[in-house]
Regions:
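N-terminal hydrophobic membrane-entry segments
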Residues: 1-192
């Protein structure tokens, strides 16, 4: 144990992951925990939020004011997402948030849910028209997130469900409510 510490090792959980191979570990000195590799499926990228590492310098630029992006190995949201594949990732040192890069559909329909379940809390938009009718408007929106912009999305919103529920839902509802106020029910149906 002293030789390990003198050679630069540290007490506690080690950040370095042992990948496949044969290792001779002194069980009186250390224990090894087996953790499955992190899998990023095709059609997704993985945005890494690291809890360890050096304090990084912001790579997001002066125009982006919602947080900082850092390079791989530094503490914070990494500026480059993990592409599809298997990764030996220390789940105690950070987390990987999956972000879909294929088109997905959000449905503003109460009992219908898309394949990713991002829209499970969405329902039809309640409108009030110029002539005082109160129709509900079911909507479907196709969303695409560029894989290079995925770290920016996670840095700003935390995850895709929060993006949908806290930003897209209020924006879409407000837009259609504003449009409906200026039109009669017949105009709204004709121009839809």
């Amino acid at each position: 144990a002293d030789r390990f510490l003198n050679a630069g090792g540290m007490r506690g959980r080690q950040l370095q992951v042992l990948v496949e191979g044969t290792y001779y570990v002194n069980r009186l000195f250390a224990t090894v925990e087996m953790i499955e590799k992190t899998v990023i499926d095709v059609g997704n990228v993985g945005v890494v939020v690291s809890y360890t590492g050096e304090q990084g310098t912001d790579l997001s630029g002066s125009e982006y004011r919602h947080g900082e992006l850092v390079t791989r190995g530094q503490r914070g949201v990494w500026s480059e997402a993990l592409l599809p594949g298997k990764y030996p990732f220390n789940t105690y040192a950070g987390k990987v948030i999956p972000v879909p890069t294929t088109n997905f559909i959000l449905k503003w329909i109460k009992n219908e849910v898309g394949s990713h379940n991002f829209d499970e809390n969405l329902s039809e938009v309640a409108l009030i028209t110029k002539d005082a009718f109160e129709p509900t408007l079911p909507l479907s929106v196709v969303v695409h997130i560029d894989y290079k912009k995925a770290p920016l999305v996670i840095q700003r919103f935390g995850d895709i469900k929060k993006l949908v529920e806290q930003t897209l839902d209020p924006m879409v509802a407000a837009y259609f409510k504003n449009v409906a106020q200026t039109r009669t029910l017949i105009q709204l149906l004709q121009e839809r």
